[in-house]
Amino acid sequence: MAKIVDIKGREVLDSRGNPTVEADVILDNGIVGSACAPSGASTGSREALELRDGDKSRYLGKGVLKAVANINGPIRDLLLGKDAADQKALDHAMIELDGTENKAKLGANAILAVSLAAAKAAAQAKGVPLYAHIADLNGTPGQYSMPVPMMNIINGGEHADNNVDIQEFMVQPVGAKNFAEALRMGAEIFHHLKAVLKARGLNTAVGDEGGFAPNLSSNEDALAAIAEAVEKAGYKLGDDVTLALDCASSEFFKDGKYDLEGEGKVFDAAGFADYLAGLTQRYPIISIEDGMDESDWAGWKGLTDKIGAKVQLVGDDLFVTNTKILKEGIEKGIGNSILIKFNQIGSLTETLEAIQMAKAAGYTAVISHRSGETEDSTIADLAVGTAAGQIKTGSLCRSDRVSKYNQLLRIEEQLGAKAPYRGRAEFRG
């Protein structure tokens, strides 16, 4: 038994300079597992609650001392003496202690940090890498794959201070033979994109996730710039590299309309579905995230019926890693993929349940970071340990993003042929 003898919480900073929660879970043999909770900017209304202090005199109200106190008090008292290897029991005990639908009492940030720290401690106690322990918890021991990275190289929306409405423009090196080659391809495209933007006299400062954040004439202009960078890097768009969007449509859905302020265009749901379908015809876009507002289920159904047979339609704000909402979406034929962010639901156990439900229904699962990240690289192990096949963890700069890519390089080196990189086969259509 990996007996828990102490739990410590603390306030640390995320990549935006805002406080977040870190937890240590200490075992009787001296092993310490540590994990940090990430934080989002564009958040779904049904996400589990991130507990903030609201004290404007500290960190502009964004302190997390209440969540830390919950770790050092009630959560610690609850879990002392328990087995860190029994992930379900730990997570369910914390969920029960919280007693709310959205973890509002203890805070999803507090529960998640402890949940992940316990998993890390248990993996060390077993003498196995975290991805192997996660595969065991997932009921898929020894079944691994290296994920296709969805690299966010132009940032807009809530992730950047520019006039671009769509939040993320991503490249996917689907033609790579392994993850290391995929990472190299992405990095080369990123550097060529910088040169393309500079040649146009555009800003090459980066946004929250490390992508460039220039002012552009339209959303399609971002795609054209990326297409030029891919070509200049020596790759073939559509074969070696495909494209993906995260619209984060809930951020520009106003009064029942989709308002693209940067382009001066306003659409109803059917019109916006046509707009997105047009982009997929002109560019090899094989994945679109949050193409409709989280509450516009009729719009989502229309978009799914229109392009879902050939394009991966990912629910982020729509599903918020929540099995109850995902189940309803599956039953209604809404989308065909789920974005997995463990702080949306607040525990490792519930995260694994969402991945399992998605896969059982033939939906894909995309493991994702948040825009507010730390050096914690747990999502890399989660992607490999669940054989999810895809990961979103930002651009090719900023160490809060690159830490995940570097962990994936280490894992691929360890696993070799046991963790295949499947490229285009991981996507629909």
From Swiss-Prot:
Database matches in InterPro entries: Enolase (IPR000941), Enolase-like_C_sf (IPR036849), Enolase-like_N (IPR029017), Enolase_C (IPR020810), Enolase_CS (IPR020809), Enolase_N (IPR020811)
GO terms, biological process: glycolytic process
Chain sites annotated for binding (2R)-2-phosphoglycerate: 167, 341, 370-371, 392
Family annotation (NCBIfam families): eno
Function: Catalyzes the reversible conversion of 2-phosphoglycerate (2-PG) into phosphoenolpyruvate (PEP). It is essential for the degradation of carbohydrates via glycolysis.
Signal peptide interval: none
CDD domains for the chain: enolase
EC supergroup of this enzyme: lyase
Superkingdom of source: Bacteria
Catalytic residues as annotated in Swiss-Prot or TrEMBL: 209 (proton donor), 341 (proton acceptor)
SMART domains cross-referenced by the UniProt entry: Enolase_C, Enolase_N
Cofactor: record remark: Binds a second Mg(2+) ion via substrate during catalysis.
Presence of the UniProt keyword Metal-binding in the record: yes
Cofactor(s) the protein requires to work: Mg(2+)
Entry keyword set: Cytoplasm, Glycolysis, Lyase, Magnesium, Metal-binding, Secreted
Name recorded for this polypeptide: Enolase
Positions bound to Mg(2+): 246, 289, 316
Subcellular location: Cytoplasm; Secreted; Cell surface
Oligomeric and partner information: Component of the RNA degradosome, a multiprotein complex involved in RNA processing and mRNA degradation.
SUPFAM superfamilies: Enolase C-terminal domain-like, Enolase N-terminal domain-like
Pathway: Carbohydrate degradation; glycolysis; pyruvate from D-glyceraldehyde 3-phosphate: step 4/5
EC numbers: 4.2.1.11
